[in-house]
């Protein structure tokens, strides 16, 4: 979380491709560290290094996808597909070979990623950057009231959503679903976001920004309200499929559009990195409270609490001042 602004700053200074390549190279070193680590202490150290680089790279890839001459969804959807396939491959390698074999598989995929990244050419973007040499600074962002308010809203909403990744499988099992069915529901919920991403240019560039902000937050509220109330288990399954991953992805896309319209272009990556840090902070702050609710009253009390938090965020979103700038087809691509 602390490293996010730093990653954003150095990406703006030296370029997304160079810094992402460097981050992936550091991850390779971290994976070799996993293979070498003689005890839990060193495993923790290398895990921290790898996690910092992965989390620091993630928001840059979202921005990178919007800078492509192709539609955002046509690029970003491969992230969802890759995640789903990667989980299956890792599980297969783990069972067929050994736990350490997973590390070697990761090394191969990262080397392939670096090779593919080196082949990417962004000529139009590079020409624009040659003309603009303004220094990157966090100061304008700290004086940007709507941006700071937006960070608070996204941090809390994403925090509630991220807590779901931890507790929803157990919540579904607590509602009566067998373990294998609950796991299947969670796995399918990852794939459900793929069509939403693929066709994101159909609505992200055209719908009013206020609607795009309120819609995923409202869906998260409905999701946890259904969890909190004595609802049929099939309704909880449906809401899990519709909301668990899709709302998080929409919030990321909304963040990209809001920042593109509200923030100076030279600070775009830095601003997105700070938003990503706020999302982690929201999770960190809400996680112990959610755990306390579970200890005191079970998953139903936790769901009431999270529904209350996101309900407040939903109401506050209508007080957010919308940016006056234009997104200029941020998600539609510009293929010549």
What are these model-derived regions, one by one?
Residues 211-255:
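C-terminal transmembrane helical hairpin of 12-TM major facilitator-type secondary transporters
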Residues 3-15, 94, 196-208, 294:
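Helix-to-loop junctions at the C-terminal end of transmembrane segments
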Residues 30, 41-57, 155, 235-250:
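Hydrophobic core of transmembrane alpha-helices in multi-pass small-molecule transporters
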Residues 54-69, 250-263:
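Intracellular juxtamembrane helix-capping segments at the cytosolic ends
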Residues 267-296:
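A late C-terminal transmembrane helix in Major Facilitator Superfamily
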Residues 69-79, 179, 263-275:
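Loop-to-transmembrane helix entry/capping segments in MFS-fold secondary transporters
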Residues 1, 146-185, 252:
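Helix-loop boundary and gating motifs at the non-cytosolic
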Residues 120-151, 336:
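Juxtamembrane intracellular "pre-TM" segments in multi-pass secondary transporters
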């Amino acid at each position: 979380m602390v490293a996010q602004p730093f990653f954003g700053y150095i990406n703006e200074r030296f370029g997304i491709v160079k810094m992402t390549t460097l981050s992936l190279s550091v991850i390779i070193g971290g994976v070799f560290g996993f293979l070498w680590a003689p005890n839990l202490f060193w495993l923790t150290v290398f895990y921290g290094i790898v996690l910092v680089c992965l989390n620091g790279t993630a928001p840059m890839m979202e921005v990178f996808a919007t800078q492509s001459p192709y539609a955002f969804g046509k690029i970003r959807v491969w992230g969802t597909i890759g995640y789903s396939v990667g989980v299956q491959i890792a599980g297969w390698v783990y069972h067929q070979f050994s736990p350490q074999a997973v590390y070697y598989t990761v090394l191969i995929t990262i080397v392939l990623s670096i090779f593919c990244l080196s082949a990417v050419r962004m000529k139009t973007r590079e020409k624009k950057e040659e003309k603009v040499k303004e220094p990157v600074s966090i100061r304008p962002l700290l004086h940007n009231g709507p941006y700071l308010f937006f960070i608070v809203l996204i941090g809390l909403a994403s925090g509630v959503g991220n807590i779901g990744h931890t507790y929803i499988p157990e919540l579904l099992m607590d509602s009566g679903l067998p373990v294998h069915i609950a796991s299947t529901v969670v796995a399918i919920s990852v794939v459900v976001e793929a069509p939403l991403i693929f066709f994101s240019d159909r609505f992200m560039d055209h719908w009013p920004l206020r609607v795009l902000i309120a819609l995923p937050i409202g869906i998260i509220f409905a999701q946890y309200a259904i969890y909190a109330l004595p609802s049929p288990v099939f309704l909880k399954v449906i809401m899990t499929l519709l909301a668990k991953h899709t709302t998080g992805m929409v919030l990321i896309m909304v963040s990209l559009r809001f920042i593109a319209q509200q923030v100076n272009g030279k600070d775009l990556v830095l601003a997105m990195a700070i938003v990503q840090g706020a999302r982690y902070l929201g999770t960190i702050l809400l996680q112990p409270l959610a755990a306390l609710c579970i200890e005191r009253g079970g998953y139903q009390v936790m769901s009431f609490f999270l529904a209350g938090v996101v309900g407040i965020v939903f109401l506050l979103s209508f007080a957010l001042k919308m940016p006056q700038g234009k997104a200029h087809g941020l998600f539609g691509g510009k293929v010549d």
